[in-house]
Amino acid sequence: MQKPAVNIMVKAARSAGNVLLRHINKLETLHVIQKSRMDYASDVDEMAEKVIVKELKRAYPDYGILGEEGGLQGNHRIMWVIDPLDGTSNYLRGFPHYCVSIALVENGEPTDAVIFDPLRNELFTASRGAGAVLNERKIRVANRKDLNGTMLNTGFSPRERSRAHAQLKCVDALLMQAEDIRRSGSAALDLAYVACGRADAYFEAGIKVWDVAAGMLLVREAGGYVCDFKGADAPRMDDKGPESCQLIAGNIKVAHALQQVIVSSGYGREFDPKR
């Protein structure tokens, strides 16, 4: 049985997903703002976030909210971390790969997570200590023992483009062992796919915390491991934590092997969490 908070999160995520689907054939009418290079927001992002916030605030008025569009509001100790549309660039181009991501964070750690893909009607949920689920089916990370034959997911953060040479060096080294490396444009779905075994691992520097808060818990509850590029614990999700981070996620053996290649390539060495 799901926790009451997760039920509310699911309701909010499905409502936001409906907003995304209602506007998918009206993309040319949307007002789009370019916040920075390769970082966009649209009317749909704002509408979806408002739907989520309304639903969550109705049930839990005292919890804080950290949203991609609205920033940090209220209580830092217990808060919702929201990305109403992870994969905005995909959505705006009609590329069918994006999702809604919601996490409940207590004292800097995600305790509950929901990622909803409205196009495929795939609902990923997790609660700390209770495992991870895709559409009512328990999921687990893949059980590979090393990088050989792995399918890896990554992203190219617009905040790290000046150091792209290091990431490309890392990709070059990984392709000597991995089967393939994918760049889908939705970090939350990348992590959800790691959690259910569709991908073996995910790595990226410069990713925003609201993109990965829910996905981190999904991977952990699916038996996986999450760390930064130095092998340390993933960042706290509160007012003391960074806005962006480095992240590796997968089963523990693949994550450790991936981390060694990342370190040797120099990728992320000059990463600034304030960027």
UniProtKB/Swiss-Prot annotation:
The keyword Acetylation does not apply. One of its GO terms (molecular function) is RNA binding. It catalyses: a myo-inositol phosphate + H2O = myo-inositol + phosphate. It is found in: Cytoplasm. Pfam families: Inositol_P. Substrate binds at E68, L85, D86, G87, T88, R182, D211. InterPro entries: IMPase, Inositol_monoP_metal-BS, Inositol_monophosphatase-like, Inositol_monophosphatase_CS, Inositol_monophosphatase_SuhB. Gene3D superfamilies: 3.40.190.80, Fructose-1,6-Bisphosphatase, subunit A, domain 1. Its cofactor is Mg(2+). Keywords: Chaperone, Cytoplasm, Hydrolase, Magnesium, Metal-binding, Ribosome biogenesis, RNA-binding, Transcription, Transcription antitermination, Transcription regulation. PROSITE patterns: IMP_1, IMP_2. One of its GO terms (cellular component) is cytoplasm. This is Nus factor SuhB. Its main location: cytoplasm. It comes from the Bacteria. Its EC number is 3.1.3.25. Mg(2+) binds at E68, D83, L85. GO terms for biological process: inositol metabolic process; phosphatidylinositol phosphate biosynthetic process; ribosome biogenesis; signal transduction; transcription antitermination.
